């Protein structure tokens, strides 16, 4: 069954109706300062459209990983302030999730008002393994919008989780995909259906174990699989080479060896790396061949030769998916690999390639390195969700919208 979208809901009419929206507002904070408001900005179009159409908008979202109880450091207060700024309208913040304050504020809403509930993960039922407990929370959320309410799923970053505000609540209300979720489904569908070739995938990040499923799913389907980041050193160890103090998953060495043998024509790995004598922004660093990593040193970025080789592959591709940085881009000394690969993808996009940045650290790197976001065809808001989609897994939050 086709997923109903926000347009379907707006066409049906929302004036005077309460609409519960599950947004992804899980932004990085430094104290109470938001360091990257990307997800808030991406969530705004759905909320704005509903408010302007006269809906009483009730937003639920999480921030960080609180332990199922209120924790001031994970309060959505800074998010509410930023959301109000982005929407250009007042955003109320409830003092609880589904308690007395949330109920009172929900009942007092007028057409076009926006209410943000406090961090949904302050309630242990949100992430409970017990479906009955999750359903109780979902029913409490439904009580806030009433019998005439609707549910809009717009948090793509959480659709791979069977959680109360993502899955159970969609079973209890007429449900729709928000602008963001609808766009993500279409974009990732384009990558899985018939991607234009050559199709290149760039995977980085720290652990092979985190990316193994997507490597195994994509390696048989793509023309080129570029591997960098911390996980690369396990592949290096699989070739019998010394990695010094670099990150290495001993338990994954045999797996990496098998992948390199099976997909020798597909997998491309760095030939040179930037190494450091310690994990710090001002560490002593040098560029070496991957054959020459000395004891006591660690690889923190791919080297310039590898950047040039990967750039040649990427600029000739017609479809590119990128997930995971090439190095520790947070440290300026070790950001060149990530920046170089990103710039090659931007160049490919300028030549007509279809490029998708798979959320998470990659999206953060684009913003932190000052790269133009519109240089890519699409920047996903869901790292884990986009990977699981490409692995071919069923995403509970999408499956329930189809029901």
From Swiss-Prot:
Give residues annotated as binding ATP: 211, 299, 330, 359-362
Q: In which pathway does it act?
A: Carbohydrate degradation; glycolysis; pyruvate from D-glyceraldehyde 3-phosphate: step 2/5
One Pfam family for this entry, by name? PGK
Which InterPro entries does the record cross-reference, listed alphabetically?
A: Phosphoglycerate_kinase, Phosphoglycerate_kinase_N, Phosphoglycerate_kinase_sf
UniProt keyword terms in alphabetical order = ATP-binding, Cytoplasm, Glycolysis, Kinase, Nucleotide-binding, Transferase
The positions annotated for binding substrate are 24-26, 39, 62-65, 121, 161
Major subcellular site? cytoplasm
Subcellular location per UniProt equals:
Cytoplasm
Extract one GO cellular component term from the record.
cytosol
Q: Which GO terms describe its molecular function?
A: ADP binding; ATP binding; phosphoglycerate kinase activity
User: What EC identifiers does the entry list?
Assistant: 2.7.2.3
Catalysed reactions, as listed in the record: (2R)-3-phosphoglycerate + ATP = (2R)-3-phospho-glyceroyl phosphate + ADP
Highest taxon of the lineage: Bacteria
Per the record, the GO terms for biological process are: gluconeogenesis; glycolytic process
Give the family, as the similarity comment puts it: Belongs to the phosphoglycerate kinase family.
PANTHER family reported in the protein's UniProt record: PHOSPHOGLYCERATE KINASE (PTHR11406), PHOSPHOGLYCERATE KINASE 1, CHLOROPLASTIC-RELATED (PTHR11406:SF23)
Subunit relationships: Monomer.
Task: State the protein's name.
Answer: Phosphoglycerate kinase
Which source organism? Rhodococcus opacus (strain B4)
**Gene name, please?**
pgk
């Amino acid at each position: 069954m086709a997923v109903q979208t926000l347009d379907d809901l707006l066409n049906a009419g929302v004036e005077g109706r309460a609409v519960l929206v599950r947004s992804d507002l899980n932004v990085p904070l430094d104290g109470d300062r938001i360091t990257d408001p990307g997800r808030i900005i991406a969530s705004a179009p759905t909320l704005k459209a509903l408010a302007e159409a006269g809906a009483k908008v009730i937003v639920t979202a999480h921030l960080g990983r609180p332990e199922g109880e209120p924790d001031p450091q994970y309060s959505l207060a800074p998010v509410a302030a930023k959301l109000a700024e982005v929407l250009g309208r007042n955003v109320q913040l409830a003092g609880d999730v589904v308690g007395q304050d949330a109920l009172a504020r929900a009942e007092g809403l007028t057409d076009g008002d926006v209410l943000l509930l406090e961090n949904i993960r302050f309630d242990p039922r949100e992430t409970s393994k017990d479906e009955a407990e999750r359903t109780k929370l979902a029913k409490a959320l439904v009580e806030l919008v009433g019998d005439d309410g609707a549910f809009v799923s717009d948090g793509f970053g959480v659709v791979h989780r069977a959680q109360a505000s993502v899955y159970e609540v969609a079973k209890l209300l007429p449900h729709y995909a928000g602008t963001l979720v609808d766009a993500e489904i279409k974009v990732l569908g384009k990558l899985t259906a018939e991607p234009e070739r050559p199709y290149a995938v760039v995977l980085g990040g720290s652990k092979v174990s985190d990316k193994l499923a997507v490597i195994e799913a994509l390696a048989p389907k793509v023309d080129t699989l570029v591997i960098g980041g911390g996980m690369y050193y396990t592949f290096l160890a699989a070739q019998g080479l010394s990695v010094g103090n670099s990150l290495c998953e001993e338990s994954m060495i045999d797996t990496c060896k098998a992948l390199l043998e099976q997909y020798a024509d597909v997998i491309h790995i760095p030939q040179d790396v930037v190494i450091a004598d310690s994990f710090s922004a001002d560490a002593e660093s040098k560029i070496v061949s991957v054959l020459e990593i000395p004891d006591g040193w660690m690889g923190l970025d791919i080297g310039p030769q590898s950047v040039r080789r990967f750039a040649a592959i990427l600029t000739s591709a017609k479809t590119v998916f990128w997930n995971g940085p090439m190095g520790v881009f947070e440290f300026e000394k070790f950001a060149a690999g990530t920046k170089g690969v990103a710039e090659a993808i931007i160049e490919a996009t300028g030549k007509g390639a279809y490029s998708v940045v798979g959320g998470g650290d990659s999206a953060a790197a684009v913003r932190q390195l000052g790269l133009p976001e519109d240089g890519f065809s699409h920047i996903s808001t869901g790292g884990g969700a986009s990977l699981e989609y490409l692995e071919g897994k069923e995403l509970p939050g999408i499956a329930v919208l189809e029901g």
